[in-house]
Amino acid sequence: MILKKRSKSSKNWLKRNFNDPYIKERNKKKLRSRSWFKLKEIDESEKIFKKGMNVIDLGSNPGGWSEYTLKKIGKSGKIFACDILPMRFLKDIVFFCGDISNSDFLKKIFLFLDKYSWNVVMSDISPNICGYSVIDNSNMFKLSNIVLKISRHVLSNNGYLIIKLFQGYGFNKYMKKIRNIFELVKIYKPNASRVNSREVFIIAYGCKK
């Protein structure tokens, strides 16, 4: 049997992940995802999560952000998680599987969300990446606009939005839009984000009603 040689890119991927301290720590702590550390950094910087908060986690699979948040808000809080892909069961979390860009599914989740007051909307959503930045960003901002629509609909006046974005095409336009909706807006790049990644996280506070 002749084994195919791994491509240079796959070798680089293996090397990068083998040497990644966050992946090592994730495995040690048995966490659901590497992105757990990104949210932890954001929270330690901004002091967002408190006991009893109600939180919406969009693009939740595999559950790293929900896992972190659950410990911060305690049993008196509530988490609604949503993803286009199924997510492994996580106790005390309400999970809906579906596509937020589908209008019928969006109506379905609003029926649930409207029953409660929400303190935080967080989104780690990312589109399928093709590698062409203009297309990737365009698809990203289509999803991000839906996240913004959900946030405006459900957030309390002193609520937070945490959302991942890609820098580059369309970024400044989206930032202008988000600054028109929230009182305070910050751009944050966690240490856990890879150096060559275009991702940044926006922390917005005080939704204008």
UniProtKB/Swiss-Prot annotation:
Chain residues that bind S-adenosyl-L-methionine: G63, W65, D83, D99, D124
EC class: transferase
Catalytic activity: uridine(2552) in 23S rRNA + S-adenosyl-L-methionine = 2'-O-methyluridine(2552) in 23S rRNA + S-adenosyl-L-homocysteine + H(+)
Pfam families xref list: FtsJ
Compartment list: Cytoplasm
Origin: domain of life: Bacteria
UniProt keyword annotation of Lipid biosynthesis present: no
Record function comment: Specifically methylates the uridine in position 2552 of 23S rRNA at the 2'-O position of the ribose in the fully assembled 50S ribosomal subunit.
PANTHER family, per the entry: RIBOSOMAL RNA METHYLTRANSFERASE (PTHR10920), RRNA METHYLTRANSFERASE 2, MITOCHONDRIAL (PTHR10920:SF18)
Protein name: Ribosomal RNA large subunit methyltransferase E
Encoding gene (name): rlmE
